[in-house]
């Protein structure tokens, strides 16, 4: 095969990453905002829903308590865990009075557990700004003050932070970059999302969402997305439709998470987010669900095709 033939075969594998990188450049970061609390800093309440998160919860909670933001309230919701999560939270609460531990009432019909836990946590909040964090996240001390400053600067009713993904196992390193690459190719950089006039382009990262209390209450809190699998995406779209300002921002130096640790967790987790959650957000997705298992590994394996064809 001559040079031109090889180049033609390789072009699709070169063009897509380049196009994705160009689109991703239109992004803004928390690094642009001050790590010092603003003048007249609002009280910020952080809600951490946790169900059977003994592996992660202590690191998450302690990272929040170590925040450089002074006016902070932390509420951890022990969602009827059976793995020791409650014991860990009780121990931390005994050491630090800023931590309030809440146990929600029984899950009512028509609700998903995370949304109900967030609702129970919000009931204990006093903050003008409320942050919802997944229990498998951890943050640096400057995340909250930078997020508050970004919310003020961008006049955001909802601000969601996209952090760094920690990858441990072989399957994580194979699958996670491909899945996030697909999402990046679809949505582009943060400013493409923020400036888009289309509701279908509005997204949020449920691992870290800040809301203005007034807007959250006005729209009905998590109750408005109580039956949605991809509740974060649905919330961003509800906010947009109702005339509220949503902002996606990078926090690669402030927020990190390890979503899954095994192939089984990857399949189950992305199954919720893509296979099921897609039905909530993309019309006609049910016709494409059969492609989901291939989507997990084919992007990575496709990288082998050009070398094989070229020889």
Which residue stretches match the model-derived regions?
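Short aromatic/hydrophobic "clamp" motif used to bind/position activated sugar donors
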Residues: 118, 130
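Acidic donor-binding/catalytic loop of UDP-sugar-dependent glycosyltransferases
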Residues: 84, 135-150
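Acidic donor-binding segment of Leloir-type glycosyltransferases
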Residues: 61-108
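Catalytic donor/gating beta->alpha subdomain of glycosyltransferases that bind UDP-sugars
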Residues: 151, 158-184, 214-217, 222-288
């Amino acid at each position: 095969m001559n040079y031109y033939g090889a180049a033609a075969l390789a072009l699709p594998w070169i063009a897509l990453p380049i196009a994705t990188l160009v689109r991703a450049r239109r992004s803004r970061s928390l690094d642009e905002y001050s790590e010092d609390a603003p003048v007249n800093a609002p009280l910020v309440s952080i809600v951490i829903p946790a169900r059977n998160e003994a592996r992660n919860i202590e690191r998450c909670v302690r990272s929040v308590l170590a925040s450089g933001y002074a006016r902070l309230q932390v509420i951890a919701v022990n969602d009827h865990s059976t793995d020791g999560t409650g014991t860990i939270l009780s121990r931390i609460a005994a050491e630090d009075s800023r931590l309030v531990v809440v146990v929600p009432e029984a899950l009512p019909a028509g609700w998903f557990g995370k949304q109900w836990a967030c609702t129970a946590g919000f009931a204990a909040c006093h903050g003008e700004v409320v942050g919802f964090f997944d229990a498998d996240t951890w943050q640096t001390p400057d995340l909250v003050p930078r997020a508050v400053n970004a919310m003020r600067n961008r006049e955001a009713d909802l601000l969601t932070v996209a952090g760094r993904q920690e990858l441990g196992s072989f399957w994580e390193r194979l699958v996670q970059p491909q899945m996030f690459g697909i999402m990046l190719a679809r949505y582009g950089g943060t400013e493409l999302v923020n400036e888009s006039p289309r509701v279908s382009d509005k997204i949020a990262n449920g691992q870290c969402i800040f809301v203005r209390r007034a807007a959250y209450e006005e729209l009905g809190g998590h109750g408005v997305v109580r039956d949605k699998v991809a509740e974060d995406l649905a919330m961003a779209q509800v906010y947009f439709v109702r005339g509220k300002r949503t902002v996606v921002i990078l926090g690669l130096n402030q927020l990190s998470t390890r979503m899954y640790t095994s192939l089984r967790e990857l399949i189950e987790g992305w199954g919720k987010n893509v296979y099921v959650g897609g039905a909530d957000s993309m019309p006609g997705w049910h016709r494409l669900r059969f492609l989901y298992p291939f989507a997990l590994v084919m992007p990575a394996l496709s990288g082998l095709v050009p070398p094989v064809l070229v020889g």
